[in-house]
């Protein structure tokens, strides 16, 4: 895949970039490693917080310009892109305010371990490689960058090849915010370069957000090198609606949850599992609202759904829908790519889906909603868990006992009750099963690339850890 900005609304190649050479990659790694050796000791939390807040200021001041860039590169609506830029600022501010507390020493009961003092100290690991996707060009990377930099790590970003301008902007704005040169660098390289970077002994760890095959590849390399990783992979999130729910509010939120970011979000609701007593009413209302969405130019403020980011992505969801309909599924609306330039696919609703269809088993990365009828809560949970993924989930019910069942029994990294799955700096984010492992954001995210070092300090009168016979 070329490293280029290709406008998905027109298919026009706007700008191409020359990939970094092997020598440039080596120089970037060396620069990052040398910077880390100094940065981890010479900077305080207060200094890093000042730079993080300054970076947030720039993101806010440049939000309109940044939004236009993201819209040009991957097709999200301008209003969505601006919200993303502002969310990035919020992420930097959160860690500027909270990093020192989140990484404070955790005292242990020294007496129980025969010590004068004992505690856990969190220290940065070093150079962290971030392999990031195109769907949230800045926010996905900031979820790593803000906590990593505040913890004392340094980062190298290998971004998706279709968002090079976003990738370069992020490194630039972080440096303009005051972080020393080399703390955060973007390398415009193909995916084939990831192995070489990750195997370099100066690179301590990796984080990846992307497809399952990409995650498997990075995990295999990191495992061979014994390097820690965080993987945030695909999702096929359920959106369950029970009879006690506010139906109109559930439908409204469900539509938003499906078409957010033009349907290209790992945590977008994709499978709508509705109790049989309200199934027909829910589907009718949902279809009506999906039909009313405006598809078109993502720079038009009136547009609800823009193009898919890539031609191959548009073709993939078209095939998933076509194959399902050919096998007996029912198309309630949408279902055909729009004529004309660009990679547009309309909001689509499919019912009567069976287990042998790709719509049932695969992630659908576009504005396509799959509908399922459930006889009771047991069947709803069974359908929700009948996937290899386990990223986010949504359940709508005002019954407290049902809420607890969903919290306890849905196999996912996140359960949102009477709402839609959203990432917040204040909440840990990640999945289970084939949606990955490890966590981003909040305290879990900043500690993900820290050495949790156990510290045991004996009294000056005793060098015997444990005070007598010891068992490892």
From Swiss-Prot:
Reaction(s) this enzyme catalyzes, per UniProt? succinate semialdehyde + NADP(+) + H2O = succinate + NADPH + 2 H(+)
PANTHER family with a match to the protein in the record: SUCCINATE SEMIALDEHYDE DEHYDROGENASE [NAD(P)+] SAD (PTHR43217:SF1)
EC number(s) per entry: 1.2.1.79
* Superkingdom assignment: Bacteria
Organism of derivation = Mycolicibacterium paratuberculosis (strain ATCC BAA-968 / K-10) (Mycobacterium paratuberculosis)
The task this protein performs is described as: Catalyzes the NADP(+)-dependent oxidation of succinate semialdehyde to succinate. It is believed to be the main source of succinate semialdehyde dehydrogenase activity in Mycobacterium.
Q: Which GO terms describe its biological process?
A: tricarboxylic acid cycle
Keyword annotations: NADP, Oxidoreductase, Tricarboxylic acid cycle
Q: What class of enzyme is it?
A: oxidoreductase
| Entry-linked InterPro entries | Ald_DH/histidinol_DH, Ald_DH_C, Ald_DH_CS_CYS, Ald_DH_N, Aldehyde_DH_dom, ALDH_GabD1-like, GABD/Sad-like
> What Gene3D superfamilies does the record point to?
Aldehyde Dehydrogenase, Chain A, domain 1, Aldehyde Dehydrogenase, Chain A, domain 2
Q: Identify the catalytic residues.
A: 232, 266
NCBIfam families linked? PRK09406.1
Q: State the protein's name.
A: Succinate-semialdehyde dehydrogenase [NADP(+)]
Q: Pfam families, alphabetically?
A: Aldedh
The positions annotated for binding NADP(+) are 134-135, 158-161, 210-211, 233, 363
* UniProt-recorded Gene Ontology molecular function terms: aldehyde dehydrogenase [NAD(P)+] activity; succinate-semialdehyde dehydrogenase (NAD+) activity; succinate-semialdehyde dehydrogenase (NADP+) activity
UniProt similarity note: Belongs to the aldehyde dehydrogenase family.
What PROSITE patterns does the annotation carry? ALDEHYDE_DEHYDR_CYS (PS00070)
The upper taxonomy is: Bacteria, Bacillati, Actinomycetota, Actinomycetes, Mycobacteriales
